[in-house]
Design a protein with these regions (language model features):
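Short, structured segments at the rim of ligand-binding sites
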Residues: 1-414
Length: 414
């Protein structure tokens, strides 16, 4: 596929947050609570959670941008977690809380991502498990209620999974946290969605207390706009849109940690529509992003640094190694491809504009966010660039290419 540059302008709506959708669908399924959910992106990760719900006996019907979950939970014999780290980790906590005996089938990529700290924490409550290549065998039949102890520094998803485990066990459940939670806003997102279904999550001095029962009353929700995906639209506007881009559907008080992008870049809110933000091409000041807190913002903001004299500072870049790809290495590879200057101290990665005449003919990243970053960089370079593996963008933002085309980029499939 070739993406050609252009002066982008216009309005788009942010895709629905996959973090919101996966949590809502899985909680609905495991609690047997009817759900209507709007603003669904139906990205690949969303579809994993939908298929898990179906394997658990729920009926899931879909329309253009919404879905309906109905039915009663049944213990599945097996489920497929695809490449979705969120669904994988959350469902481990949910299945353990339901005392299920189940096989979780994994992709090769997902099988290599961290899970053992969560399994070790749940094993203290009676979970037994075995990993055979691409299958995780879980036996929750011996699960007992009690405290869960989890390290928050590895992944916020481990903490969210522990909270969901306690909600399924019922009664009062305690989750004790050691070390600071990375991307802790996602735990708040889990807690707030869970509370809509009945259970309350209260933060304590050293963790969380989960109380209350599921009320099982039919629920109607709408997924927030996805700030992680919107980071690419903001970068495109700041680099390539003299007339400006407006993005709709972004909740200003979202629990998504990546809503912090609003404080990292120059953007303006729409007084008439509080969920809309505008960006336009301008000279940029230096941008800083902490990869420990906002790893998904590092790729789009790195692109801003690549075409800015002030540059972009990425703190704790080592946290980018544990994502779907080694984003630490990939971001540097992308920057070099466009002639950008790089300073890497290990604790801090600094990228800024370099040889403006350099650009690649072909980019071949394999991870969805790096592919999107490469596409925005190509447009900003002013040159047509070929991109492979673009089908992987559907993991998080299926309408990305059509949105860019609507804004004025040239998109041609070869």
């Amino acid at each position: 596929m070739v993406v050609s540059p252009g002066d982008l302008h216009g309005e788009v709506t942010a895709p629905g947050s996959k973090s919101f959708t996966q949590r809502a669908v899985l909680i609905s399924a495991f609690s047997s609570t009817p759900l209507v959910l709007g603003n669904v992106a139906f990205c690949d990760d969303d579809m994993v959670s939908i298929e898990i719900a179906k394997k658990c006996g729920l009926n899931v019907s879909t329309s253009k941008n919404s879905l309906r979950v109905q039915g009663e939970f049944r213990h599945p014999d097996s489920i497929f977690a695809g490449e979705s780290g969120t669904s994988y980790r959350l469902v481990v906590g949910l299945l353990a809380g339901k005392r299920s005996i189940v096989d979780i089938e994994l992709s090769r990529q997902l099988a290599g991502r961290p899970i053992r700290p969560l399994l070790a924490a749940l094993s203290e409550r009676g979970l037994t498990y075995r990993m055979d290549d691409l299958t995780l065998h879980l036996d929750g039949s011996g699960i007992t209620s009690g405290k869960i102890r989890i390290d928050g520094s590895e992944s916020s998803q481990f903490v969210s999974a522990s909270v969901l485990f306690q909600s399924m066990i019922g009664g009062e459940g305690i989750v004790m946290i050691s070390n600071r939670i990375v991307s802790g806003g996602y735990v708040n997102l889990t807690a707030n969605i869970l509370s809509r279904f009945g259970p309350a999550v209260r933060e304590t001095e050293n963790g969380f207390r989960v109380t209350g029962e599921f009320n099982h009353a039919p629920l109607s929700l709408s997924a927030d706009g996805d700030y992680s995906a919107t980071g690419f639209l903001f970068s495109a506007g700041l680099l390539c849109s003299p007339d400006g881009i407006v993005v709709h559907g972004l909740q200003p008080n979202s629990d998504q940690p990546d809503s912090a992008v609003l404080q990292m870049i120059p953007c303006s809110s729409d007084a008439a529509k509080e969920d809309s933000y505008a960006v336009s091409k301008r000279q940029l000041e230096q941008i800083t992003v902490d990869a420990a807190s906002n790893p998904d913002l590092a790729p789009p903001l790195a692109v801003l640094g690549m075409f800015s004299e002030a540059g972009c500072r990425i703190m704790n870049p080592g946290r980018l190694r544990g994502k779907e790809s080694d984003r630490y290495a990939d971001i540097k590879r992308l920057a070099r491809a466009f002639g950008s200057r790089i300073q890497d101290s290990g604790d801090l990665l600094f990228i800024r504009k370099g040889d403006s005449g350099r650009y690649p003919e072909l980019l071949a990243f394999t991870e969805h966010r790096m592919i999107m970053a490469g596409i925005i960089a190509g447009i900003a370079s002013g040159k047509p660039v070929k991109h492979s593996n673009v089908e992987k963008i559907a993991k998080s933002y299926p309408s990305f290419l059509s949105d860019l085309k609507r804004l004025g980029a040239g998109v041609e499939f070869l």
